[in-house]
Amino acid sequence: MRAYLQLMCKRFRTAVVSAVLLWAGAAGALPKPHVVAFGKWTSAKWYVGPAEGKPLELKVRALFVDTRLKEYTTGVPHDVTDRLFVVRRVFRLNDTLPSESTLAPRWVWERGGWLLVDRVTGRVTQITLPEFDPFYSTGSWYRDYVAYCGVSDDGKKLFAVVAQLGRRKPILKRVLGGPDGDDLPDSECPAPAWQRQPTRVTFQPDETQKITFGVRGHAVDIVNDTEEDEEGGE
């Protein structure tokens, strides 16, 4: 009887230890929650113009994931979902010449494209936007769409572009004409204006040109003046 009790106690202890180990393993397999946060705003100088001699104030703040610096950002983030958001990227570029003998790099601020941030996984990725020019293009977000005026690689064409997250090609790319080639940022056209019900976006690169597109899923159609007048009279 005594031997039987000892055997049962031993089996019980083994079962308890096994259960604890299984629980610990399962707990370790669970994904750890990530903390995504922004730092404080700071002012930086962004030099523009033909000789890059005109300083503009650039509001910058750091993006941290689990207290680790990931990127520098500017502007207000846009929440795509309760999990994903996008924000404009800025970065520091080494402006030191090969002939300059200095131990410390000469850093200058530059504006980049857009970042996609996942609050759950903590992943930060750069978004590839066709014809997006970091100097001239101003992105206007609505849901998972972004509208902007893009510039061709040779600088001779200005495009109305609508892109959607998760799609490699834009759902809209239409030539608006030629860029003015101004030396100031965001000077080619203002941020496009969105509206809902129905979903539409309006581009107005100058006072003489205004064009509206209707967006339905992955399809985009131009909206003529007659349609706008009819809806305005309802």
What are these regions (language model features)?
Residues A3-V16:
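Bacterial N-terminal signal peptides that target proteins for export
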Residues V17-L22:
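Hydrophobic alpha-helical targeting segments used for export or membrane insertion
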Residues A24-A26:
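N-terminal signal peptide c-region/cleavage motif recognized by signal peptidases
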Residues G28-E234:
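Exposed acidic/polar residues on beta-strands and adjacent loops within beta-sheet cores, strongest
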